[in-house]
Amino acid sequence: MEGLDGTGKTGLVRRIVSDLKSQGFEVVRVRVPTDRIRRSWMFQQVHNLNIQSDVDPLAYEVAYMADRLQLSGAVIKPALDQGKIVVADRYLISSIGSLLVRVPELLDVIETSYTSSGWFNELVSNLVQPDVSFFLHSDADVAMTRIAKKKDERAFDLDANFYRHVFNLGKSFAVANEMVLLDTTNVTAVNINATAQEYISKILRWSHADT
């Protein structure tokens, strides 16, 4: 489940996990960045202290990729091998979703990494590939209003035009990788969940047919 802050992504993940468990499936929920990197010095500097000058943008993106690789190999793959379903709150394009809206200085590094860097694409090929990926998006003003209402969200300056630029970057990558686009601007959480569940049900039917 990919998407920028303010699109309802985490809430949708919770509903999907709950629905799958109610159907009797064993479900593992993961999120990117993981708690491991959230406790790191770099993450604390950028997200909690709002200090970007001491953090090299490329080093930060490499750390994010290492976090994804560790999660993929040590958590996701073993869970799938055990027949469990894994639902990820951000995964492949987590940098676009969680970093750029807070740290615009990372734009050049992340944009280059996602569009033309051989090292990035080579590392991505080592990640467990999702059976289905969703990219949630919303009108910038609506998303920023949602962000402002989150009690646990550290205040940070968010420019609507920059948010739109980041969204367009994420959307282009999502389209190129055949992700399912879900617009959450004027749609209820119940309806968004129902749409997502249609795709998930198809995947589960295909998986059952293969076995």
Label each PLM-derived region with a short phrase:
Residues 1:
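Hydrophobic anchor at the beta1->P-loop junction of P-loop NTPases
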Residues 6-7:
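ATP-binding Walker
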Residues 10:
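Walker A/P-loop
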Residues 15-17, 141-211:
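NTP-dependent small-molecule kinase module
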Residues 21, 80-81, 175:
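Anion (oxyanion) recognition and catalysis
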Residues 25-115:
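ATP-dependent small-molecule kinase phosphotransfer cores
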Residues 28-30, 87, 132-134, 180-182:
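Hydrophobic/aromatic beta-strand patches that form the interior of the parallel beta-sheet core
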Residues 94-168:
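A glycine- and Lys/Arg-enriched "phosphate-lid" helix/loop adjacent to the NTP-binding pocket
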